[in-house]
């Protein structure tokens, strides 16, 4: 139909090129993650998004800045579980922040993290690769930040 239409006949030569779908390998997404996780805005909902971007980027220093801003803006609200999971993990990985007085959920954070560690140590002793461990632990821990941190690599949101 296009070839028969007088108006479209004029542009048909412009369509003679190799049509290849391409991408930027996530560079645009990484730019946006970095931009938003470093943005300053006093709006609580905006600040929560900066914390989410810091979680996705797995940047520990950036996480702590955003975490404390979030805690200050939501002082009377319970801390969401994934934020507690990240704070507990990062506090144990790097001793730059004292987490000893943070009110972590005893069962959902402390107990579950102990189970996560036991499972990962057991699978490591069995000689599993990181990929195999991730798959084995996904049913029980796939909904945790810990699982995301250790087993999700090269994540793209699209």
Question: Across the structure, where does each feature detected by a protein language model lie?
Answer:
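Solvent-exposed soluble domains appended to multi-pass membrane proteins
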Residues: 1-158
